[in-house]
Design a protein with these regions (language model features):
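Structural motif
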Residues: 5, 74-76, 114-116, 161
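N-terminal active-site segment of His-dependent metallophosphoesterases
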Residues: 1-21
């Protein structure tokens, strides 16, 4: 089955240093160039450790700013928010630029059709228990501003589905009526007994969204996104819990 498009969610390489990363990104770009389908790229943190967005753009030969793609009955929002992990104080970790958040807010407030939002970093806030990388590094599994991202998603009046990479496992988490998907990595091995997962996914968009992951860590889900949002959560039941 020929896809309508190929979506690269980022982390095309494991970063080493600038010169090595330039070479590795070029090798990956050559492989993508052979595909007989439109390819849309998002930068992950490993693509950004030693390289700029501009360098990634030059290697891939594409623009890597935020973008909306019309898919007919649906639209694809390529939310290419900054995915660089900062390693020096005071802002260690991810830091979501306000400009990226405002762009997403404006885009979703004006959305008129069901929307797939693709990013590198997930924003559902889902549990990282059991995750090899993030159980003990949960702050690096998402943006510190993830709660604001979810508030932005709640502004939309159309069905939404969010898909991300970064956390190296297959998950579905529904928050406020919006399904959040994370896709397993092609080369990850912590869920596959030390061998590469060889994972890749197929997403079919319609009234029901069908997601399949192939390879050695298979997964399948059928989702029915809604334009309705959930009732706001209750306040704490007990004053002691509120104080805590």
């Amino acid at each position: 089955q020929k896809p309508d498009l190929v979506l690269d969610l980022g982390d095309r390489i494991s970063d080493i240093d600038t010169q090595t990363d330039l070479r590795l990104e070029g090798e990956v770009a050559d492989v993508f160039a052979r595909l007989n389908a439109p390819v849309y790229h998002i930068c992950g943190n490993h693509d950004r450790d030693h390289l700029t967005v501009a360098e990634n753009e030059e290697i891939l030969g594409v623009d890597l700013h935020n973008q909306v793609i019309d898919l007919g009955d649906w639209q694809l929002v390529l939310w290419r928010a900054d995915a660089k992990i900062h390693r020096t104080a005071p802002d260690i970790g991810f830091d979501l630029p306000e400009s990226d958040l405002l762009w997403l807010s404006h885009t979703l407030q004006h959305a008129t059709k069901p929307t797939l939002i693709a990013s590198h970093v997930p924003c559902s806030g889902h549990s990282q228990i059991g995750n090899y990388y993030f159980q003990r590094n949960e702050s690096l599994s998402t943006y510190p501003q993830a709660d604001r991202v979810r508030e932005v998603l709640a502004q939309a009046r159309v069905p939404l589905v969010c898909i991300a990479g970064h956390v190296h496992w297959n998950t579905v988490t529904t928050v406020d009526g919006t399904p959040h998907i994370t896709q397993q990595s092609l080369t990850e091995s912590f869920t596959t007994a030390g061998e590469p997962a060889r994972a890749w996914g197929m997403l079919e968009l319609g009234e029901t969204v069908h997601w399949q992951v192939f390879g050695d860590d298979p997964f399948e889900a059928r989702l029915t996104p809604s334009n309705q949002r959930w009732t706001a959560p209750l306040q704490p039941f007990l004053s002691k819990l509120a104080a805590e």
